[in-house]
């Protein structure tokens, strides 16, 4: 996935997933750790390249990734 906006814009999109998360700055990338109580999903974003990568439990990740892609396409 790709996102070329600002961190605040990305946070707004991620908030639309309605899954609580905490954001952390990790040097060259930003990380959103989702707190859904059932998975270990994390969203990594490299602002310089725009690369977005969702990692964690595939059972939950696939659905969240699909929803996130839809939100990004419709913004």
What function would you assign to each model-found segment?
Residues 57, 71-75:
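Conserved short beta-strand edge segments in small beta-sheet-based binding/regulatory domains
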